[in-house]
A protein has these predicted regions:
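Glycine-rich cofactor phosphate-binding loops and adjacent beta1-alpha1 units
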Residues: 132, 137-138, 142-219
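Mid-domain Rossmann-like dinucleotide-binding core that forms the NAD(H)/NADP(H) cofactor-binding site
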Residues: 71-149
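Hydrophobic beta-strand signal
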Residues: 40-41, 98, 189
Length: 283
């Protein structure tokens, strides 16, 4: 969202409000569709107040789930996981699904959706605490600590015949490790590349010929392409939340708008566990 390069959205300009997903309360409305007190989500950015058109907002139903869930599992994060896995990854029951950034906002949901679908799941995360979270709290079959283990060897240990779906949130060396361990017909979902966003030289996959040898494919996905189907995903995932099949963990930081830069940087150090949310405290 900030890189001055061709992308799926224009970069944020200098002196423009920093783009971000928001959960807000309506304090005044001239629209018959929204009233004072309604909770809404949108992309109003890092600011305390915003003027918005009703068509750019989505009303939140607190009776369906805790409002914070609309920034995570029932928001863009959940939509990314749902459509990335099911529409691009095309998992089949008993497939081996490997997820990088698995303790992050999208990754943890992808793994749980794969389990609901009957897949074997392997999560890649950094540190013992995150790996224990994956296996002990949200049901991944195996976890790999990229900080202390050889990722390629560990994937091979848990997926003897190779992986069937790799959901990539990280890029770089971990993507390389996945490419070394593809099953025939594997699908790689390119969702993000957090390891590459701040580098001066982006590391591309050197062993891409593995796609040829294994008749595999690698495809990028942008969640906005599925906007007309968000309702489908929200309905299904809200049901799984109520049934206890799906869990959502948010890492909520309470502070002011001025705390955003420090909070944002947690994403790049791996300090967050789950969806990172800055909750603006009332003055």
């Amino acid at each position: 969202w900030m890189n001055d390069a061709r992308s799926y959205v224009p970069p944020v300009r200098i002196n423009q409000v920093m783009r971000a997903l928001t959960l807000s309360r309506v304090i005044e409305s001239k629209s018959p569709d929204l009233k004072e007190g309604d909770l809404v989500t949108g992309t109003q950015g890092i600011q305390e107040y915003a003027v918005a058109k009703p068509e750019d907002l989505n009303r939140v139903d607190p009776a369906l789930a805790d409002p914070s869930r609309y920034l995570s599992v029932l928001g863009m994060t959940g939509m990314t996981a749902y459509f990335g896995l099911f529409d691009v990854g095309l998992p089949k029951p008993d497939d081996v699904v490997v997820v990088s950034g698995a303790a992050g906002a999208v990754g943890q949901i992808v793994g749980q959706l794969a389990k609901i679908h009957g897949c074997k799941t392997i999560g890649i995360a950094g540190g013992e605490e995150k790996c224990k979270f994956l296996t002990d709290e949200i049901g991944f079959d195996h976890a790999i600590d990229y900080k202390s283990q050889n990722v390629a060897k560990e994937i091979r240990r848990y997926a003897k015949k190779g992986l069937d779906v790799y959901f990539d949130n990280v890029g770089g060396e971990i993507l390389e490790a996945a490419l070394f361990n593809l099953n025939r017909g594997a699908r790689i979902v390119i969702c993000g590349a957090i390891s590459q966003y701040n580098t001066t030289a982006v590391q591309g996959p050197r062993n891409y010929l593995s796609l040829l040898v294994n008749r595999a494919r690698m495809e990028g996905m942008v969640v906005f392409d599925y906007a007309e189907r968000y309702g489908e995903a929200v309905e299904k995932m809200a049901g799984w939340l109520k049934e206890g099949k799906l869990k959502s963990k948010e890492d909520i930081v309470k502070g002011r708008v001025t705390d955003f830069p420090e909070t944002f940087l947690k994403l790049f150090s791996g300090a967050n566990l789950g969806k990172l949310i800055l909750e603006i405290e009332k003055v």
